[in-house]
Design a protein with these regions (language model features):
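Walker A/P-loop phosphate-binding motif and the immediately C-terminal alpha-helix
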Residues: 2-40
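Conserved catalytic-core segment of NTP-binding enzymes
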Residues: 103-107, 111-114, 118-209
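Conserved beta-strand scaffold positions in the cores of enzyme catalytic domains, especially
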Residues: 2, 85-87, 197-200
């Protein structure tokens, strides 16, 4: 199952949501691969605290697209909290942009389902080649939206393109929401996008601080509303019943409590 996290506009928290949603799925026992296909401005490795990406011996997505590495050589296991995820990072080095063949992204999308039950793709913003590949070759897409004029306008275009190519639109996440300043609420955005709101994540300085320091907020602050919202979305994507979701939440809470005593 490939689920691409998309947005018509940059800076809306798409990468942060992709990383933390991937960890939420891993936390309920799912095999997860998180992929960065933002070719020009990749940030996923930074959000996940992978400071060793550029100095490591293994490859990145850019090397695969340049024909210099096999896909399996670019996928790395990452211990995050009490779970493990697979990550296919993109390179942060400018020189790796040379000779990248984005047409090879189709081959990547056809191959990545073999590596995990759930593949979460951090798409590039907008409607460039890599963003269109994420929309066209995924089983489902989740839009990340913020309640701002520019973001809404760009996301309306993204949704229009997604519908034209018959993409499986799962819904949208309303991110960085503030009741006092938002020009629209979740219900109004459902009408605008003709799609379901999967969850609302309120503006929270702790999230920004975690993102800036490369620490997933779902691990640092597992009980804040944003973390609980992503866990509910993960349970929904996994097809868990309400009872299974409650049991998973209990197990996660117990695991977090036990980890405190091990410190």
């Amino acid at each position: 199952m490939i689920i691409s996290i998309v947005s018509g506009k940059g800076g809306v928290g798409k990468t942060t949501i992709t990383a933390n949603l991937g960890l939420a799925l891993a936390d309920i026992g799912k095999d997860v691969l998180i992929v960065d296909v933002d070719i020009e401005m990749p940030n996923l490795s930074l959000i996940l605290g992978m400071k060793e990406v550029e100095g490591r011996a293994y490859a990145t997505l850019h090397d695969v697209l340049r024909g210099e590495a096999e896909l399996e050589d670019a996928i790395v296991g990452r211990e995050m909290g009490k779970s493990q995820v697979l990550v296919l990072p993109a390179s942060l080095a400018l020189e790796k942009l040379k000779h990248v063949r984005e047409d090879r992204l189709k081959e990547v999308f056809l191959a990545i389902p073999d590596f995990a039950e759930f593949v979460l793709v951090d798409s590039a913003p907008g409607l460039g080649k890599s963003a269109l590949a994420a929309i066209c070759y995924s089983n489902q897409i989740i839009l990340v939206a913020t309640p701002e004029i520019a973001a809404i306008s760009d996301n309306l275009r993204t949704m229009e393109v997604a519908r034209r190519v018959n993409a499986g639109i799962k819904g949208f996440v309303l991110n960085r929401y503030q009741r006092e300043t938002a020009i629209v609420n979740a219900e109004e955005m459902e009408t605008l996008f003709n799609a379901s709101c999967l969850g609302v994540i309120f503006e929270d300085k702790r999230i920004g601080a975690c993102t800036a320091s490369g620490r997933p907020f779902i691990l640092e602050y597992p009980s804040i509303e944003a973390s609980l919202t992503l866990r509910k979305i993960a349970a929904m994507l996994a097809g868990m019943s309400s009872e299974e979701e409650r049991e998973s939440e209990k197990a996660s809470a117990l695991g977090r409590l036990l980890s405190l005593f091990r410190r």
